[in-house]
Every structure is written in structure tokens, then in C-alpha cells.
């Protein structure tokens, strides 16, 4: 199983603001692009992939939207507007939820009111965590564990205080090269590296 977490610090937790954020300061289109590149390949979708989007621009609780490739049925296509609409439906389903609650949105998609920190604590129990960092070990040289989870951010960097928490969870830093890439580009390179290794 390959898992990805995108910490979308600028992404709002209401569907209206999310949709308005496409192409604007929040850059919510990154969610659609990352979903497309984690889940889909030409004429098919990948098996055994999970992506978690943690949307943090909120007045109450962060929203963690989880999409499981093995369980999604008909998401309606894989162009940007369709994919961002799936995220918006999850946000609509989360209205009125209390802290640390979960709701199923549709097959393969759930929404939870949990923070990034809480999510990665849970994932660390049965995944090896990898954080992308230009100063990390080059991915071609890195040993990737059997149940990897890759941590990414939107255009707002990971807060420095998060690094110590992630380190305590055994997170390893890996690098995809000298250039700072979009999260949606990173997932393509990670998938390709693991595909080449016949993971």
C-alpha cells in the first residue's frame, strides 16, 4: 500500500471557499492535481493507493479527506473540476461534525475532523513516514519500507515545530532532487521510483 498525505495549510474547509480558491491565493487546485496523479494512470487507476488531504484554513477543526483507490467507484472523471468537486462534497458532508468524528461521503471517500498531527500519529503506527526535503537522502539511494507514507505540503512550508514531532515518529527525510516541485509533481516521481523497483 502506498499512502500520501498532503497538508494543505491554505485550503479552506467550506466547499464554497474551496471552489473559489481554485486559481486564487489558496491554490486549491493542488488538491485536484495531486488526486489525479496519485490515483490515476492512463486508462485506469492505481490499486492500493490512499491519499489524505488535510485542509487547515478553518474556524473550527481541520478536515482530513481520505480517498482509497481500491474503493472508489465512479468519481465522474479525472479533470480538475470533477476532482475538486469530490473534495467539495466531502466538505459539505462534514458540516456540523464535532472534533475527531468520521463520515463516509461516498464509496472510497471519507472525511474526518482530525488534525495533521493526529493523523500522522495514527499512520506512524503501521507505516514508515517519509517527508520530502531537499536536504534529505536522494530517493534513488533511499531504502523505502514496505508500507510507506509520504508527507507533502501545499505552497506553505511545513511549520518548524512539526519537524520535531515528525522526527519523534521516526520520519525519514527524502529528496527528489535540487528543485522545489509541486506536490502533484512529487507524487508522480515517487510512484515512478516505486514502479521501477517493482514495489
UniProtKB/Swiss-Prot annotation:
One of its GO terms (molecular function) is tRNA methyltransferase activity. GO terms for biological process: tRNA methylation. It holds the Pfam family Methyltrn_RNA_2. Its EC number is 2.1.1.-. S-adenosyl-L-methionine binds at residues 132, 186. It comes from the Bacteria. Keywords: Cytoplasm, Methyltransferase, S-adenosyl-L-methionine, Transferase. It is an enzyme of class 2 (transferase). Its main location: cytoplasm. One of its GO terms (cellular component) is cytoplasm. It is found in: Cytoplasm. Belongs to the methyltransferase superfamily. TrmY family. HAMAP family: tRNA_methyltr_TrmY. This is Putative pseudouridine methyltransferase. It comes from Vibrio campbellii (strain ATCC BAA-1116). The lineage of its organism: Bacteria, Pseudomonadati, Pseudomonadota, Gammaproteobacteria, Vibrionales.
